[in-house]
């Protein structure tokens, strides 16, 4: 979702480091113009894998009464704030991100598919997702009733569009970093989350809490984990030039 956005101090430092390495013939091994041919494993760098766990009590799902468009939405909506695999304690829908240390090199450029938000049976699908700044988001209404997609970032409206039944999808570029709260003003119980980063070093946990992040530059980096109910936790990890780093983190 490319768009004009103010360059952060970290991004400016990275840019200056790139310029200096080109001028002095430094170690810009990641540059396709300067680097010698590499194998696929060398070019992607190390892999960070792990699991996000939760061993605490899991609250029972909440049942909400539906008082509008119940023929499509149903008479009740089930809201489950935590999804935990009983066998492994793996936590689903946690977003894991590697915060690069300043001066560790530029963010890797990757091709990304459009981020899709679907209004289906009066729910946003997916409920949680992560994306990169500049990615395209495509919003669909699959229901025979009108919806409204209202995206809020830092208490400001980033997007507010009506989604008529049978209408064309809305296509926009993500231009704001951070946590995006997605709501429907027509059906107040509809809510979802998008987390937008300025680099591709992120992943979302599976049903068993697993994640995998590739191509991270070597160095001491901070891994941050976000969950809609449990909040944020962090851990500093030393990433080698190659190989696999295993990081398991647990919400208490």
Each model region followed by its residue ranges:
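Extracytoplasmic copper-binding redox domains, predominantly the cupredoxin/blue-copper superfamily
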Residues: 34-252
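N-terminal secretory signal peptides that target proteins for export/translocation
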Residues: 1-12
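Bacterial N-terminal signal peptides
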Residues: 14-29
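Hydrophobic alpha-helical context, especially transmembrane and signal-peptide helices
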Residues: 10-12, 16-17, 41, 200
